């Protein structure tokens, strides 16, 4: 669960070893780096025996305490049903230490994975972790290729089914012409950094997904799910390990009927101004600008709805204190996205009212 930035002390320590890395000194670096991270209490063993980093807020970790690998398996690999796909193409956003990619390969050795990560330090760390799946060696080899090539040492990984892009995921998606069956969306929480939760970024993801493709995220944030609906996804949810709220599954043109999200969230996404998505039309705004822009648009939307007599407080929406004709829509045999759009159309006369 990428809730925050990695701990600054951890990043400083890792950078120190990145400077002396030459490919031949991995064993020596492993011993010293892991020891130093543990001594500084920034590398933490989780309940499944795998390791994660402390986050910027030292009370938090970058993965759930139940286990970094366990989280990758039960929040991403298994819900994606990757084992049922032949030669699936996977987009692994915010790859971090590689746990999600490792789990995906473990459950489908024929997966073609595009890993995207902006933080070199967390990628570098995976070279020195002991992750109990043999597929870790594949990911390590691709990371090794990146760091050796960067310092001018020629090295070619044997694994052509893994691609690694180090940089802003927004720039990557604009240039990509691939179509994906599975997208692991493991970004920091939208409250902290909404950069990869905007309607505009998610729309680009949608365009690059195959029919029946699924995007999976640990986040169940209302603006995120609202943006997914506006992009055309059919949203669903599944119970999550280590968290009270479920993970989000978003399908493109599924040939089956996904389970619905809870009815309270359906109503809030359909009718509350807090469902207003983040926007980043140029795919280049800073996180602070994205947050500021949404706050401004939210106030304008609220004023508009009050003026036309269509403003409902989130509290009354959650309690179901809304017009009966709108409430009845939730009894219809539709998926969550269809229900949300129908409620908006009936109440606001505009299913796309939140895309300002």
Swiss-Prot record:
Among Pfam families, the record links this protein to:
Methyltransf_30
**CDD domains named in the record:** AdoMet_MTases
Q: Which GO terms describe its molecular function?
A: oxidoreductase activity, acting on the CH-NH group of donors
Q: Which InterPro entries would you find in this protein's record?
A: MnmC-like_methylTransf (IPR008471), SAM-dependent_MTases_sf (IPR029063)
Q: Which PANTHER family match?
A: MNMC-LIKE METHYLTRANSFERASE DOMAIN-CONTAINING PROTEIN, SLL0983 PROTEIN
Q: Under which name does UniProt file this protein?
A: Uncharacterized protein MJ0670
């Amino acid at each position: 669960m990428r809730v925050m930035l990695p701990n600054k002390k951890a990043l400083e320590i890792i950078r120190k070893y990145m400077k002396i890395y030459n490919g031949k000194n991995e064993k020596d670096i492993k011993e010293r780096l892991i020891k130093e991270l543990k001594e500084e209490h920034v590398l933490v063993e989780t309940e499944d025996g795998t390791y994660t980093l402390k986050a910027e807020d030292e009370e938090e970790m970058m993965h759930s305490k139940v286990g970094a690998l366990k989280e990758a398996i039960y929040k991403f690999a298994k819900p994606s049903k990757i084992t049922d796909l032949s030669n699936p193409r996977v987009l692994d956003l915010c790859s971090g230490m590689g746990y999600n990619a490792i789990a995906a390969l473990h459950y489908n050795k024929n997966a073609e994975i595009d890993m995207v990560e902006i933080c070199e330090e967390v990628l570098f760390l995976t070279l020195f972790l002991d992750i109990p799946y043999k597929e870790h060696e594949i990911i390590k080899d691709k990371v090794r290729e990146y760091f050796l090539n960067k310092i001018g040492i020629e090295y070619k990984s044997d694994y052509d089914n893994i691609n690694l892009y180090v940089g802003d995921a927004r720039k990557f998606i604009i240039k990509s012409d691939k179509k994906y069956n599975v997208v692991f969306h493991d970004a920091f929480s939208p409250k902290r950094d909404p950069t990869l939760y905007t309607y505009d970024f998610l729309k680009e993801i949608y365009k690059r997904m195959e029919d029946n493709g699924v995007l999976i995220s640990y986040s169940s944030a209302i603006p995120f799910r609202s943006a997914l609906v506006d992009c055309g996804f059919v949203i669903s949810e599944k119970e999550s390990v280590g968290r009270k709220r479920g993970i989000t599954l978003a399908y493109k043109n599924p040939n089956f009927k996904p389970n619905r999200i809870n009815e309270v969230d359906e109503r809030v996404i359909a009718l509350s101004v807090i469902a207003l998505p983040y926007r980043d039309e140029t795919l280049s705004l800073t996180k602070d600008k994205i947050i500021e822009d949404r706050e401004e648009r939210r106030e304008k939307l609220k004023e508009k709805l009050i003026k036309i007599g269509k403003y409902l407080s989130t509290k009354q929406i959650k309690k179901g204190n809304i017009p009966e004709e709108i409430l009845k829509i939730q009894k219809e045999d539709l998926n969550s996205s269809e229900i949300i759009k129908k409620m908006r159309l009936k109440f606001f006369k505009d299913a796309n009212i939140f895309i300002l």
